[in-house]
Every structure is written in C-alpha cells, then in structure tokens.
C-alpha cells in the first residue's frame, strides 16, 4: 500500500501527520515554498515528490540536502534541479 508523509517544508511550517495506508489525502498549502513528501513504505525505492507553492523556491537548499536514503536521494536531486 501507499501513503503520504511530508518530510520537509518551509521554515516554521508544521507538517501534517503521516497519512494512513491507501487513504486519499487532500492538502491545502497556505505557506509558499517547497514541500518534500514520500510514500513511507517505498521512499528508499524513489517514491517521492515535491509540491511547490507560489513559485517560491527559497528553501531549495534545505530540500535538496535532505537525506531520505536509497534511490530517493538521487531522485530528489533530479527533481529539485528541474525547478
């Protein structure tokens, strides 16, 4: 199964709790910046993603240096460099 777990976001933002497996997630983002999320069971295989709110990439360095582990680190660098 899959879920959504936010690992990082803009400074000062309280990240939501990890979602339950195989449950739909609806999020509202009020703070501009980059948010990093993973599928917890599959993150080391590269199942990660980014949400960019308001075209604000000011926290890009924080996000690109986050250590997820496994294949995810390479994928994270690719995703951030595409911004």
Regions found by a protein language model. Name each.
Residues 1-83:
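Extracytoplasmic copper-binding redox domains, predominantly the cupredoxin/blue-copper superfamily
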